[in-house]
């Protein structure tokens, strides 16, 4: 009996461990700063007015266009979602069978089990019903800024950026990660771009410590909210 209880406890612990969300780890090489692949050639002083080292247009701004350049992304994300679902199933059935004769003969009305006449009439009725309602709402807001580096410049001029920011506090650590694609036209003169203009954005905000632990439900709550709960 004790061995059976131990097996059930071990199985429950394994199932609950699968409900825990993975925690982001520091020093992910994917979000490491991207440095230029090759050093830029030294500008040749071949004239007092025109020099071959300057490749920018005369009327263009000095923006981040090369691999390894730095861009600041201002985070201004607000999302909200709501979902309602309801279902109701009901089934009623009934049947009555009335017979006055059986094979051409009328049955005897003598009831050996008590008073009253016997009858061939029969009937049944049944009723089944099920009803369910569910509702889920969620809202998130993320504001701030993060400075990333240019990881790649695509042939069509789209710039791929990615980066992360770790903040070590007294009660733990907080992490902000972002990766995505931006247009050169969306970059302001101070090399900033809003997060709403980042295509295919992958934004992660998580943390460790007492604050992060306090915002997580307990293991028993996760069990009741998981698909393992049969009701």
UniProtKB/Swiss-Prot annotation:
Sample GO molecular function, one term: cytoskeletal motor activity
GO annotations of cellular component type: bacterial-type flagellum basal body, distal rod, L ring; cell outer membrane
Membrane topology (UniProt): Lipid-anchor
PROSITE patterns xref list: PROKAR_LIPOPROTEIN
GO biological process terms held by the UniProt record: bacterial-type flagellum-dependent cell motility
Alphabetical list of Pfam families matching this protein: FlgH
Subcellular location: Cell outer membrane; Bacterial flagellum basal body
Lipid-attached positions, S-diacylglycerol cysteine: 19
Keyword DNA repair: no
InterPro entries recorded: Flag_Lring
Positions where lipid (N-palmitoyl cysteine) attaches: 19
Swiss-Prot/TrEMBL keywords: Bacterial flagellum, Cell outer membrane, Lipoprotein, Membrane, Palmitate, Signal
Signal peptide start-end: 1-18
Family: Belongs to the FlgH family.
Subunit details: The basal body constitutes a major portion of the flagellar organelle and consists of four rings (L,P,S, and M) mounted on a central rod.
PANTHER family to which the protein is assigned, alphabetical: FLAGELLAR L-RING PROTEIN
Function: Assembles around the rod to form the L-ring and probably protects the motor/basal body from shearing forces during rotation.
Protein name, per record: Flagellar L-ring protein
Naturally occurring in which organism (per UniProt): Pseudomonas putida (strain W619)
UniProt lineage: Bacteria, Pseudomonadati, Pseudomonadota, Gammaproteobacteria, Pseudomonadales
